[in-house]
């Protein structure tokens, strides 16, 4: 055999066989010598070998003829058999109802370009079948922590991969040193992989544009090498051991646009990154040991997003005043941040997070931020002046959680574009009067607003979709709710004085209802009117004894009556043909006949029965059907 053969190729690099550079293993697999990663193990079948020898040309021709015949057979087929591939990946124990099968079906519809197997680690056993997907460009194996290294090495044979996600898997230094085989890779994520200590091998990925190594806490080598990747535009090293020395390895004239160093506690000085004029997104949240170089932030003229949450030495916005292109700014939990002077120059800001800035007392400087759409001032304990709020005419989202000094809802009545409002923990609010002008409001949170006594002012909010009400101890009547005809989700918790729940039964469009720790809730006869209900949670409502109309809720997918200790009847439970999740924990008053009806629920997947008297015969039948029991 002379020159390059036209009838065979190496199973690893997919290059045609060349005489003199091949080895034949006893398992009859042939590879280029340089492609054999482990010296005494076959990369294809992982069989251990006792010796290696040069491939015989005549035997190669015989193997190649068989290979070509197999290729002709495959070419004549209509495509890859999803069922067969699913069984191979799952070691033969996978059915057509498995998650692997569903993911493969989705990939087939996309012409096998994208395959997402994240979270399928409990089913995946053998990745060898992936070699048939030669067109695969995007693969996600995140959370598949049970796959051994020899299985993960199969991924390196998919030479057309552009994007690869391997979060929280068993990849290690050996895998990283071999990844250079993926010549076209542009996106790589190996977050949370504790076996990685040296990332020097990643520098062979000359086409790489985005790299994420978040939470790879054991990395000690290679930070300086990856910073030299010529095409790298996005680098994320959150919760790693990056130091000031590693920061100095980043070339100021590089192409980096996104840089994330959140919770890197070894970083103390930001001076080294001051020359990176190309940066558009920078995250330093949780880097609480930074004491130097904050003045360098003003040099990032192209910066669009900045997160310096938790910076203990940031006291004023003056160092940020030149970032005129900034659209997103987060300085949350900067305990010493007091002075907002300088923010008024950031006229392009869309989103501002000041939550947990205990020193902020006035919002006067935000009045000029006419483009602001989202503002979070939760937990600003010293805030007493809200004069700037009424001028934010484009504001759509406002979080005022735990701002105890906020008492007058009328101060925001002119914010007509408001879509989401969180007033949780504003315990001095006594009335919702003023909210009726926010006609576009879609989500409202009123948790811990203990002085509110009525919903009457918000009855006209027809666009409201989600309402959270918790620990409103003085709320006795739900009148006004019936007018919110567009409400889809209602969460009512700990309203112990409330006695009139009738308005809830008029919410014909509601899909999710949660009523927990409502001590006076007894009569649920109106439930039958909520025909579109998909999720119902009745938690800790001890006065409920029968629920005789539950069988009429044909669209119900999730039902929870946990810790309703006096519940004795669930009428029509067997008619809930769409029910997928059922929680009867702590319902010790239910009879055996109720539990027997569980065997008639065809779509049941999860059952919670802790603290209930569930017959053994029911548990055995549910286990046989593959129901997850807790």
Curated annotation (Swiss-Prot):
- RING-type Zn finger ranges: 10-46
Recite the UniProt keywords alphabetically: cAMP biosynthesis, DNA-binding, Leucine-rich repeat, Metal-binding, Repeat, Zinc, Zinc-finger
Question: What molecular function does GO assign, one term?
Answer: DNA binding
Q: Where are the LRR repeats?
A: 184-206, 207-230, 231-251, 255-277, 278-301, 302-324, 325-347, 348-370, 371-393, 394-416, 417-439, 440-462, 463-485, 486-508, 509-531, 532-554, 555-577, 578-599
InterPro entries of this UniProt entry? Leu-rich_rpt_Cys-con_subtyp (IPR006553), LRR_dom_sf (IPR032675), Znf_RING (IPR001841), Znf_RING/FYVE/PHD (IPR013083), Znf_RING_CS (IPR017907), Zyg-11_UBL_adapter (IPR051341)
- Has UniProt tagged this entry with the keyword Cell membrane? no
Gene Ontology biological process: cAMP biosynthetic process
Main function: May interact with adenylate cyclase to regulate its activity.
Query: What name does the UniProt record give this protein?
Result: Putative adenylate cyclase regulatory protein
């Amino acid at each position: 055999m002379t020159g390059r053969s036209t009838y065979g190729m190496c199973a690893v690099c997919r290059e045609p066989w060349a005489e003199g550079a091949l080895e034949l293993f006893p398992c009859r697999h042939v590879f280029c010598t340089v492609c054999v990663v482990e010296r005494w193990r076959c990369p294809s079948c992982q069989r251990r070998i006792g010796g290696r020898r040069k491939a015989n040309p005549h035997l190669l021709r015989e193997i190649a003829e068989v290979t070509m015949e197999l290729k002709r057979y495959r070419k004549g087929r209509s495509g890859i058999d999803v069922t067969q591939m699913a069984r191979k990946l799952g070691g033969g124990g996978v059915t057509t109802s498995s998650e692997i099968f569903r993911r493969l079906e989705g990939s087939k519809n996309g012409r096998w370009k994208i395959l997402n197997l994240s979270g399928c680690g409990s089913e995946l056993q053998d990745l060898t079948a992936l070699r048939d997907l030669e067109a695969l460009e995007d693969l996600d194996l995140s959370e598949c922590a049970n796959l051994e290294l020899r299985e993960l090495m199969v991924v390196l044979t998919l030479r057309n991969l552009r994007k690869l996600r391997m979060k929280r898997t068993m990849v290690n230094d050996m895998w990283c040193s071999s990844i250079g085989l993926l010549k076209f890779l542009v996106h790589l994520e190996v977050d949370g992989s504790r076996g990685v200590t040296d990332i020097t091998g990643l520098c062979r990925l000359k086409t790489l544009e985005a790299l994420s190594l978040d939470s790879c806490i054991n990395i000690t080598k290679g930070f300086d090498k990856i910073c030299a990747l010529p095409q790298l535009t996005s680098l994320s090293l959150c919760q790693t051991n990056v130091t000031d020395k590693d920061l100095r390895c980043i070339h100021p004239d590089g192409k980096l646009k996104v840089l994330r160093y959140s919770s890197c506690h070894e970083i103390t000085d930001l001076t080294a990154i001051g020359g990176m004029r190309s940066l558009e997104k920078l995250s330093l949240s949780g880097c609480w040991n930074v004491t130097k170089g904050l003045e360098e932030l003003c040099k990032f003229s192209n910066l669009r997003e900045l997160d310096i949450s938790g910076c203990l030495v940031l006291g004023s916005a003056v160092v940020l005043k030149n970032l005129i292109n900034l659209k997103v700014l987060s300085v949350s939990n900067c305990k010493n941040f007091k002075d907002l002077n300088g923010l008024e120059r950031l006229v392009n800001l869309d989103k501002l997070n000041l939550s947990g800035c205990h020193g902020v007392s006035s919002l006067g400087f935000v009045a000029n931020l006419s483009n602001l759409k989202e503002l979070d001032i939760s937990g600003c304990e010293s805030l007493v002046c809200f004069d700037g709020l009424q001028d934010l005419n484009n504001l759509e989202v406002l979080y005022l959680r735990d701002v105890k000094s906020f008492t007058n809802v009328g101060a925001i009545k002119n914010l007509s574009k408001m879509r989401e409002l969180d007033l949780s923990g504003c315990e001095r609010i006594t009335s919702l009067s003023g909210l009726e002008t926010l006609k576009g409001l879609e989500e409202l949170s009123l948790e811990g607003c203990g002085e509110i006594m009525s919903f009457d002012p918000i009855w006209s909010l027809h666009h409201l979709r989600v309402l959270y009400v918790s620990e409103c101890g003085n709320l006795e009547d739900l009148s006004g709710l019936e007018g919110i005809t567009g409400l889809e989700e209602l969460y009512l918790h700990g309203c112990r004085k409330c006695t009139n729940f009738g308005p809830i039964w008029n919410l014909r469009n509601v899909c999710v209802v949660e009523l927990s720790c409502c001590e006076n809730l007894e009569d649920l006869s109106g439930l039958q009117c909520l025909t579109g209900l998909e999720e119902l949670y009745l938690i800790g409502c001890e006065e409920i004894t029968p629920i005789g109309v539950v069988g009429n809720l044909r669209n119900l997918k999730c039902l929870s009556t946990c810790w309703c200790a006096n519940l004795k009847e669930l009428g029509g439970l067997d008619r809930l043909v769409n029910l997928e999740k059922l929680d009867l924990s702590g319902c010790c008053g239910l009879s055996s006949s109720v539990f027997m009806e569980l065997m008639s629920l065809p779509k049941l997947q999860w059952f919670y029965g802790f603290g209930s008297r569930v017959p053994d015969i029911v548990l055995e039948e549910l286990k046989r059907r593959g129901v997850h029991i807790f």
